[in-house]
Amino acid sequence: PYIKVESSLQAVKDIAEFYLQQLQIPVVGITGSVGKTSTKEVIASVLKEKYRTLKTQGNFNNELGLPLTVFRLRDEDEIAVLEMGISDFGEMTRLAKIARPNTCVITNIGTCHLENLGDRDGVLKAKTEIFKYLQKDGHIVLNGDDDKLCMVKEYEGIKPVCLLYTSDAADDS
């Protein structure tokens, strides 16, 4: 016996989306031009102090890697920290549809993948596709030091939290 599908990749993505929805656990979705993996590691490290946390292994962050990560989730897991990498328009929408994050983190808007995305404005547009599937009571965390991310003021009533990383922080005592 077998199940015939038009696209095995689409079937894997659809099953991962369904599986994650059944588990009903919070998801932190992380994207950005650089720093995704380091940010994922830091967030997962903090969360695992209190919650049973599953994180993306390595950088299994594409349209096959994300579903494979989701399939590692078990009933006892309490939160998922999922890295999402893209190189073209529409990819983030497809990844976010699977993950449906409660919290979106965007590390920065750089110059990676300009061959498909055109310029940094294109990168911003592609990365912020993650918001389309953000949970209604969700959170957006942005790098406040990134000039492009500072332009994101809100998404459907959700105002982003912008984190600043400056060397002046120690001088504010």
Language-model features: locations:
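Conserved beta-strand segments of alpha/beta enzyme cores
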Residues: P1, R52, K159-V161
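Short hydrophobic/aromatic-rich beta-strand motifs
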Residues: P1-Y2, V141
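Proteins enriched for Cys/Gly/acidic motifs involved in redox and nucleic-acid/cofactor modification
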Residues: E41, C162-L163
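Conserved beta-strand termini and adjacent loop/short-helix elements that scaffold enzyme active sites
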Residues: V5, T56, N143, L163-L164
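Phosphate-binding loop of NTP-binding sites
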Residues: Q10-G144, K148-E156
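N-terminal pre-Walker A segment at the start of P-loop NTPase domains
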Residues: I3-L9
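Conserved small/polar residues in nucleotide/adenosyl-binding loops
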Residues: Y165-D172
